[in-house]
Amino acid sequence: MTIDAIKIHLQENSKDLTNEFKRLFHGRGGLYEGWKNLTVDSIDTILSVALYHEEENESELLGMLQEFIQTSQHTSIVLQRRYLKGAPSEVIVGEIPENVFVVENGMKIKLNLLSNKNSGYFPDMKIGREFVRENSKDKSVLNLFSYTCAFSIAARLGGAYKVSNIDMSKGALSTGNQNHHLNDLEMLGISFHPYNILKSFPRIKKKGPYDLIIIDPPTFQRGSFEATKDYQKIIGKLPQIASEDCLLLACLNSPDLDEDFIKQLIKELAPSFKF
């Protein structure tokens, strides 16, 4: 796929843009030959670009993107080089405001586009957040690996009366708290707990049982979680913390493990859950 073809693709996908987040180019999906290491996102007036591997024609690509925003709604470009140590980000065109947030189905989530690694928002779980919003009315929700708590916001907007957010990162939970206030949500029943999930099930169980459980871990986090050996530990605890009619949203962002990995764990360790 040529760089000119990418530009045409971006223009086609930009015709119906609003202030809501939209992925304009998803090279990571493996559908565009030669560009599996490129993603381009629209965040209101910001064009957010990520490179997962060094590109020989990077300067030509960036030149095309600068041409593209001349006729799009974007006024700035942020580039993240995820292949470099620390995954540094920089503003290469224009300026970005001090406070940036993404909009998803009317829900606001605070972003840090210049942070290392992750910005605070994972667009691939949009459909998951829609599911939670549609299925959380009058439910007690457990949000494991909550990070900046987007699932919690979706649950409260959907009518959950209680949400317990569990994550090791106090900083992420603090941002999650801010995200709730950003959406003008009632905080009664919303809690934030900086627990090591694998070591804290007695405390998690004490706050149950739960009517909706969300598991959205990293594939690998040094010293705290490794999907291939630790996911089963969480699945095995589900019968102890789930209500009789509990819904489970089990997620895993791994290029090496497919849905059968999770299905088999549930079949073996929590057979009361049915697909």
Regions found by a protein language model. Give the residues of each.
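C-terminal substrate-binding/active-site "lid" region of AdoMet-derived donor-dependent transferases
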Residues: 229-275
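Conserved class I S-adenosyl-L-methionine
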Residues: 138-147
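Short strand-turn motif at the edge of the Rossmann-like AdoMet-binding core
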Residues: 217-218, 224, 251-255
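Conserved SAM-binding loop of SAM-dependent methyltransferases across substrates and taxa
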Residues: 148-160
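Non-catalytic substrate-recognition/targeting regions of SAM-dependent transferases
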Residues: 31-34, 38-41, 57-122, 130
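S-adenosyl-L-methionine
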Residues: 168-214, 223
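Conserved SAM-binding motif I beta-strand of class I
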Residues: 162-167
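Non-catalytic accessory regions of SAM-dependent methyltransferases
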Residues: 1-44
